[in-house]
Amino acid sequence: MSSGGLLLLLGLLTLCAELTPVSSRKRHPDCDKPPDTKICQTVVRAFYYKPSAKRCVQFRYGGCNGNGNHFKSDHLCRCECLEYR
């Protein structure tokens, strides 16, 4: 991995750590909503949290702004939706 890639990864991990309180935290309520797969604009790769699998899953997001359970990366999805104990 290039040094630029490592710096980006370090920055994302730092951001996730800063946004995650040290104490126990529950996931955002939008993380329990189903993915919005309607097509309104350009289709892009996105991730949503799948509660039954307890993980983030890739899907095709059509830009309809349906709910808050869509993220640009798996990392951002995990930061927002995984429970920390």
From Swiss-Prot:
GO molecular function: potassium channel regulator activity; serine-type endopeptidase inhibitor activity; toxin activity
Keywords recorded for this protein, A-Z: Disulfide bond, Ion channel impairing toxin, Neurotoxin, Potassium channel impairing toxin, Presynaptic neurotoxin, Secreted, Signal, Toxin, Voltage-gated potassium channel impairing toxin
One Pfam family cited in the UniProt record for this chain: Kunitz_BPTI
InterPro entries listed in its UniProt record: Kunitz_BPTI, Kunitz_BPTI_sf, Prtase_inh_Kunz-CS, TFPI/VKTCI-like
Location of this chain's protein in the cell: Secreted
Cleaved signal peptide residues: 1-24
Summary of the tissues where the protein is detected: Expressed by the venom gland.
Domain BPTI/Kunitz inhibitor: 31-81
UniProt record similarity statement: Belongs to the venom Kunitz-type family.
Subunit-level organization: Heterodimer; disulfide-linked. The A chains have phospholipase A2 activity and the B chains show homology with the basic protease inhibitors.
Name this polypeptide is given: Kunitz-type serine protease inhibitor homolog beta-bungarotoxin B2 chain
Organism, as annotated: Bungarus multicinctus
